[in-house]
From Swiss-Prot:
Residues 20-29 have a biased composition (Basic residues). Residues 1-85 are annotated as: Disordered. This is Nuclear RNA export factor 1. Residues 61-118 are annotated as: RNA binding. Coiled coil: none annotated. It comes from the Eukaryota. The modification 3'-nitrotyrosine is found at Y126. GO terms for molecular function: RNA binding. The modification Omega-N-methylarginine is found at R42. Involved in the nuclear export of mRNA species bearing retroviral constitutive transport elements (CTE) and in the export of mRNA from the nucleus to the cytoplasm (TAP/NFX1 pathway). The NXF1-NXT1 heterodimer is involved in the export of HSP70 mRNA in conjunction with ALYREF/THOC4 and THOC5 components of the TREX complex. ALYREF/THOC4-bound mRNA is thought to be transferred to the NXF1-NXT1 heterodimer for export.
Amino acid sequence: MADEGKSYSEHDDERVNFPQRKKKGRGPFRWKYGEGNRRSGRGGSGIRSSRLEEDDGDVAMSDAQDGPRVRYNPYTTRPNRRGDAWHDRDRIHVTVRRDRAPPERGGAGTSQDGTSKNWFKITIPYGRKYDKAWLLSMIQSKCSVPFTPIEFHYENTRAQFFVEDASTASALKAVNYKILDRENRRISIIINPSAPPHTILNELKPEQVEQLKLIMSKRYDGSQQALDLKGLRSDPDLVSQNIDVVLNRRSCMAATLRVIEENIPELLSLNLSHNRLYRLDDMSSIVQKVPNLKILNLSGNELKSERELDKIKGLKLEELWLDGNSLCDTFRDQSTYIRSVVACVSAIRERFPKLLRLDGHELPPPIAFDVEAPTTLPPCKGSYFGTENLKSLVLHFLQQYYAIYDSGDRQGLLDAYHDGACCSLSIPFIPQNPARSSLAEYFKDSRNVKKLKDPTLRFRLLKHTRLNVVAFLNELPKTQHDVNSFVVDISAQTSTLPCFSVNGVFKEVDGKSRDSLRAFTRTFIAVPASNSGLCIVNDELFVRNASSEEIQRAFAMPAPTPSSSPVPTLSPEQQEMLQAFSTQSGMNLEWSQKCLQDNNWDYTRSAQAFTHLKAKGEIPEVAFMK
């Protein structure tokens, strides 16, 4: 940047001074500058970014220096394409399209130090369905060299970013198909020579950022904590300095938000009207950088869908301006528009529940429960059995089943399953890397049909016949169940087919997750067995991590040691009292003795304690197993 042959460093008489800030977000927004000649400069020169990337042709990278080869893309509608036949049907395979006018030698660019660099676009087909942090960490774990993704973004269904040298691109090429997603599909990584990303081409120089700060200081009203950036590109001071600040460019928006974050994070009102914004992806960081923002003016821009507001929905806005955007044209008239957005279930109120004014119109007060006190859920009810006979049958079955299940050798469960039994396991959907989850031991067998769409895999994960079921159960981690935590519900019953579920907690007793507490729900469908017991025909097991409350309650009351008769050291009077208490309370001898001992063998006080605890539902079902 030059002005009559002078470099920027020669203009020492013009400075921008900031107040010293020990912590971000404190102090006024003040810039002090002296008088002097305005320096001139040119910002944003070079290739101007288009709104949508123009694509033409499908290419694949063989070596970093090779030219692009045309590859057949089964999803394209363009005729007269030649290429390879479709292969690897079980893999995600979508090719990447190159820019319509690639630079010579593909991807050459110039760094700030003047050296030439090769740029490459990295594309992950269907990458939008993956979390950014998980995706990049998985790629980095498989890549032989460390890399820095530049301008990571989602475009349609794809995830894309840039790297700046051929060796990194080659290393990323080697990661292709080496990562498995949560549905056991291999992730494709396509490498493409590319022009330098727009953030590099259009990045503001340090001296231009200083000028931007100066202009923004003039537009800031400290008394209202309001910043007016209306039509910023046409600001006379910026125009006179030949600085092109286009807020729909990622680099310019990032620079602007950085200035706000460093100087006025306490900002309450921001006017971004008439800046030709057509998407808000680059504004998403405003939620963290300006958390107190109450008023936002986006009028006179080019937003086409209210879905763009999802990018900033974390803001606690009270006033929003959207008129003059294409999204408003979908409503026939202003009254229809206002009626459509004031409803609690409307698109805008869903994103900004505290909104009071829209385009200057007062909205009805939001219907919301803005109460800091936590909502108390009703207490969970105890077990439900229907009849005493069924209760005795089910509790006896569960006692036998889990005694074998926790014994270390589950082969004894063969007698508990029907020859044609089936069994499945599910764990909740894990947004982060499943392999690093504490439930990793269960992940490979999880048949969560909400996330698992492949019918072949669904069928394979369903265990059929009692031999396969018990073999599968033997592979699961060894456990110890807290029988005192069990809550049993009989949801359906016929004379020959009871269906019941049991909820509770258990801990793993060996392996990497030893002593880890899990919560489970298990649903059994059974038929009568020849030994007057039950025989399982369907077994569904759901496992998750235990909540903090479940962890606190788990194994708090140790189960009594099973015994068929009272401890022989009891006196004849105590044994007589024990038999009477067991008969009247319905509890077995072990729990009856525990209740009497806890109350110093005072029969009346023991009866009162029993009645009180039973009314509160604090006596476990195991106490009534005889």
